[in-house]
Curated annotation (Swiss-Prot):
Key word Transport present: yes
Residues with PTM Phosphoserine: 3, 102, 124, 131, 138
Family of this protein: Belongs to the globin family.
Protein name in UniProt: Hemoglobin subunit alpha
Length: 141
């Protein structure tokens, strides 16, 4: 459960990402594909080369979904319901991949926002991304 301090940390950090959210989303995806090659199976139709338009496009989708989640941090299940349905029923993404992408996103944010990425912010973002992952996998049952 996200505490009030966690919510403040998440919102504050996300506001600092600003216009870079799509860029950071794409970078996190690239990082995931490089470090966890098994995740590529869901993207066999993508050009997975560095800087590909498809990775940038999907990075933007990831970033937009997270921006929506931050904006609805008190009601993640409703905010992410359609996305949860998509990943569970149509795409059938292995739930572990959400954890892998979350890890890669944390690394990306730590690299780009080193002064802001304090231990408490790291913990808050980790809890937030775990909450998002839980919602996205809730309809797998």
């Amino acid at each position: 459960v996200l505490s009030p301090a966690d919510k403040t940390n998440v919102k504050g950090t996300w506001s600092k990402i600003g216009n870079h959210s799509a860029e950071y989303g794409a970078e996190a995806l690239e990082r995931m594909f490089i470090n966890f090659p098994s995740t590529k199976t869901y993207f066999s139709h993508f050009d997975l080369g560095h800087g590909s338009a498809q990775i940038k496009g999907h990075g933007k989708k990831v970033a937009d979904a997270l921006t929506k989640a931050v904006g609805h941090i008190d009601n993640l299940p409703d905010a992410l319901s359609e996305l949860s349905d998509l990943h569970a029923h149509k795409l059938r993404v292995d739930p572990v991949n959400f954890k892998l992408l979350s890890h890669c996103l944390l690394v990306t944010l730590a690299l780009h926002l080193p002064a802001d990425f304090t231990p408490s912010v790291h913990a808050s973002l980790d809890k937030f991304l775990a909450s998002v992952s839980t919602v996205l996998t809730s309809k797998y049952r």
